[in-house]
Regions:
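Sec-dependent N-terminal signal peptides
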Residues: 4-13
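Residues that line or immediately flank small-molecule/substrate-binding pockets and catalytic motifs
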Residues: 8, 48, 138
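Sec/Tat signal peptide C-region and signal peptidase I cleavage site
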Residues: 14-18
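Short, well-ordered surface patches within globular domains
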Residues: 19-83, 129, 133-135
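A well-ordered secondary-structure block
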Residues: 77-157
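Short, solvent-exposed mixed-charge patches
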Residues: 160-161
Length: 161
């Protein structure tokens, strides 16, 4: 399994409005699907099990301010299976940004999606044609103010037969 991580360095000076995290998560799915369509790849749809997987891990990253695909001692595949996602394909993108100032909803989503698009490994995950499901979470650390983002991609085992 390939593992990729990246850091987003944002400079959005003077932005005072706080991001609506649920809207950011929706916008990440929309931005991902827009990118997939531009590249001739079908859409991914939100999956509740992958959403729970992404949320649990993003919350862990934000709580501990650790940043690694295995930060909790588990792989993305093990985390997905623990939430009931029986897969033949699973992949994970993670990101965080260093700037703890306020962000608009659209700016935060746009920067996260663009960062993944610009990273070869994350781009591969985003454009994996066999992936049909996604789960997204964005959580802000109470300690550092960093935003941690997790995007899961997958395909259920039943769909691979």
């Amino acid at each position: 399994m390939r593992r990729f991580a990246f850091f987003v360095f944002l400079s959005l000076s003077g932005v005072a409005q706080a991001a609506d995290i649920v809207a950011v998560e929706r916008a990440i799915v929309e931005g991902t699907n827009r990118f997939r369509h531009e590249q001739g790849v079908g859409s991914v749809r939100p999956d509740s099990m992958l959403d729970r997987t992404a949320h649990e891990f993003a919350e862990y990253l934000a709580r501990t301010d650790r940043f690694d695909h295995g930060a909790d001692g588990r792989t993305p595949a093990i985390r997905a299976r623990a939430h009931g996602y029986d897969y033949c394909l699973v992949a994970e993108n993670i990101a965080y940004q260093f700037d703890s100032r306020g962000f608009t909803t659209s700016a935060l989503a746009r920067e996260l999606v663009q960062g993944w698009k610009d990273s070869p490994g994350h781009r591969r995950n985003m454009l994996e044609a066999r992936a049909v499901d996604t789960g997204v979470a964005v959580v802000q650390s109470r300690h550092s103010g960093r935003f941690y983002a997790v995007q899961m991609f997958g395909r259920r085992r039943a769909a691979c037969r």
